[in-house]
A protein has these predicted regions:
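Short solvent-exposed beta->alpha transition segments
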Residues: 50-51, 66-115
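Alpha-helical interaction segments
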Residues: 8, 42, 55-59, 75, ...
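Repetitive helical segments and hydrophobic/amphipathic motifs
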Residues: 12-13
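Exposed beta-sheet edge and beta->alpha loop/turn motif
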Residues: 105-168
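C-terminal motif of bacterial Sec signal peptides marking the signal peptidase cleavage site
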Residues: 17-20
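Short, low-complexity N-terminal intrinsically disordered segments enriched in polar/charged residues
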Residues: 22-62
Length: 168
């Protein structure tokens, strides 16, 4: 019995000794994105930006956070979380209905960043139509405003990523 006690005690002390020697590895922060100037034709950039914009708009329209942030740089993904996204998407949906028309305008070279610009037209949300009717106005006779959409892109480690989107 005494031998069993000694053996068990030795085993416990050995396990404790090994676990005490183990140090927790510090959490590794991924390196910051390296944005490099990159030559790209406007046609190539437009193709990339069209896909990114479609993902972003679909994410906003359908409350799909993962689709919305899919094409953004890591730094943006680190600051935007589902809790911040929910009111952003709700606000977007309150102001804009479904995308009706999207017209590419141009690419702007802004040093290490490129801006791709479109003119967008959305359907009028139901709540806005109802508000117009309550005010005695016919929604069909009031044009839906167009928006200017600008997507800011940068080349991160050889891959184009979105850094910001602006609706004016």
């Amino acid at each position: 019995m005494f031998r069993k006690f000694i053996f068990t005690s030795a085993a416990i002390l050995a396990v404790l000794g090994f676990s005490a020697c183990k140090t927790a590895a510090p959490e590794q922060t991924p390196p910051a994105s390296v944005i490099t100037p990159a030559e790209v034709s406007p046609d190539q950039l437009k193709k990339i930006a069209d896909v990114y914009l479609k993902d972003i708009l679909t994410g906003l329209e359908t409350n799909d956070y993962k689709l919305f942030v899919k094409d953004f740089a890591r730094e943006y993904k680190d600051t935007m979380n589902p809790e911040k996204f929910a009111p952003l998407a709700a606000g977007f949906q309150a102001k804009n209905g479904k995308l009706q028309n999207l017209k590419y305008l141009d690419c702007l070279d802004q040093g290490i960043f490129k801006s791709v610009v479109w003119k967008a037209k959305f359907t009028r949300p139901k709540a806005q139509e109802e508000a117009l009717r309550r005010d005695g106005k016919d929604p069909a006779k009031i044009p839906v405003p167009e928006l200017l959409v600008r997507l800011l892109l940068g080349n991160v480690n050889g891959e184009w990523k979105a850094f910001a989107i602006f609706f004016n």
